[in-house]
Amino acid sequence: KIQHIEDIKKIRNIEKTVKGISNIPLFDISTWNSGEQYKHEIMKKYHTPSVDCIQDYKYSYEINNNIKEKIIKKIGVDDEKKCVIFPSSTTAICCICDYLKKNNYDKICILEPSYFSVAPCLDSFGVSYYKEYISLDENGIPIIPFSSIVNNKYNAVWITSPIFSTGIYYERQNLCLLKKLNQKGIFLIIDESISSPNKYIANTFQENTISIISPPKYIGINSQKFSAVICDYPLEQFLFDWIDVFCG
């Protein structure tokens, strides 16, 4: 069982009980959906092309390269980087966990707090991981456990930006430390799925890095969301081979 989901089930049962007693519906503070006013305003500016055919398969790996190049340019990463489109961030996480397993990354560090599906996905693929915890200084600036990561000799670090459930982004001094980890040969997986586009940190690192972004999620467009994985050529080829297995 996934503890996070079990906890949500308990909360939902409590909500039902309270509603049954008071007959007052509770406000769902964990919903991903936007308010009605925001939806109304965003639809004034959001236009999508009409669908010309609903019968044929449309595979994500058949998306025009021009579109992927525009995404790469928008993020500001090196032109040599590649872009692989996934239906969602969670499916991207699954494929990345599979990559870690198949390429012998056997000591993963998850910087906590992280998205709830990361640890269960690593578990399901049989990838060993350990958790290191971010703290905040007196000014609210994140403190990365740099020495612990180096001393424990992790070969990959899973980072969530902004720090999950906090809205706190990494400061310049944090990025310098992450860059040092990268220069030591540590593979960085950066989940920027709910990051503001002007706060992406993928362009801080040149190689041995993978970044997950999901631009529609940031502005609350959840019914047509996608996830883009920014990576180097060898990893792109791996994901192309396996995306059809996991995503259909």
Show where each model-derived region lies:
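Short acidic, S/G/P-rich loop/turn micro-motifs used as interaction or catalytic elements
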Residues: 33-36, 163-167, 218
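Conserved beta-loop-alpha segment that forms the PLP phosphate-binding cup at the N-terminus of a helix
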Residues: 64-71, 79-105, 227
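PLP-dependent aminotransferase-like
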Residues: 91, 98-161
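Active-site phosphate-binding strand-loop segment of PLP-dependent enzymes
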Residues: 136-197
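Short, conserved active-site loop motifs that form the nucleotide-linked donor/cofactor pocket
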Residues: 83, 186, 209
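N-terminal "arm"/small-domain region of PLP-dependent enzymes with the aminotransferase-like
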Residues: 1-66, 186
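PLP-dependent aminotransferase class I/II
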Residues: 212-248
